[in-house]
């Protein structure tokens, strides 16, 4: 969708929402949808993270788009959403490159073994901080198997199982 926004002239937000999430994982894949979302920032067809081809994160930060704030994504039970927000759109090339990022996210991720191994630690830290600092996360881990007993929803938290994240 394209929607006019008169409040912030010269700025645009870009999203790609996919109807895929942890509910589509098999039990031996718990956490892989979320892991793939993380890998979207570690290299793609057109953003390689090499001296001649900056990574998505480096390209965005060079254009004033902050990783984690204006460049982010999330995976839920039934969707994965990527966004690049507050993009300065004075130049057509910036719009083109941002659309190329969305294109790469939907089709052309690089899944380099070294990057995968590095990302395992990032996922572990996210899991640890959510469990340590968020009672709601621990409550969901306890409640979902009871509330959704007998359905696919009883065991499909997007963060997944760390033993699967470690060993796929």
Regions found by a protein language model. Give the residues of each.
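Acidic/histidine-enriched alpha-helical segments
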Residues: 52-58, 110-128
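M16/MPP (pitrilysin/insulinase) zinc-metallopeptidase core fold and M16-derived inactive scaffolds
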Residues: 10-85, 148, 154-167
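Short alpha-helical scaffolding segments that buttress acidic/His motifs in well-ordered protein cores
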Residues: 36, 98-102, 143
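Short acidic/His-enriched helical or mixed secondary-structure segments at domain edges of catalytic enzymes
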Residues: 122-147
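Exposed, low-complexity coil/turn segments of extracytoplasmic
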Residues: 35, 92, 125-127
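M16/insulysin-pitrilysin zinc metalloprotease superfamily fold
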Residues: 43-46, 84-119
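Mature N-terminal segment immediately following signal peptide/propeptide cleavage
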Residues: 1-13
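Surface-exposed patches in mature extracellular/periplasmic domains of secreted proteins
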Residues: 51, 68-73, 110-116, 135-136
């Amino acid at each position: 969708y394209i929607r006019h926004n008169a409040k912030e002239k010269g700025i645009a937000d870009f999203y790609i929402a996919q109807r895929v999430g942890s509910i589509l994982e098999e039990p031996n894949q718990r956490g892989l949808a979320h892991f793939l979302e993380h890998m979207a920032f570690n290299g793609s067809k057109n953003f390689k993270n090499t001296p001649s081809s900056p990574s998505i994160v480096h390209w965005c930060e060079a254009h004033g788009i902050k990783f984690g704030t204006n460049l982010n994504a999330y995976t839920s039970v039934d969707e994965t959403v990527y966004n690049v927000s507050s993009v300065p759109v004075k130049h057509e090339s910036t719009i083109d490159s941002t659309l190329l990022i969305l294109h790469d996210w939907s089709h052309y991720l690089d899944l380099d073994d070294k990057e995968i191994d590095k990302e395992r630690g990032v996922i572990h830290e996210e899991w640890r901080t959510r469990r340590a600092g968020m009672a709601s996360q621990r409550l969901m881990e306890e409640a979902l198997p009871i509330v959704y007993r007998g359905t696919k929803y009883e065991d499909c938290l997007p963060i997944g199982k760390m033993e699967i994240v470690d060993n796929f």
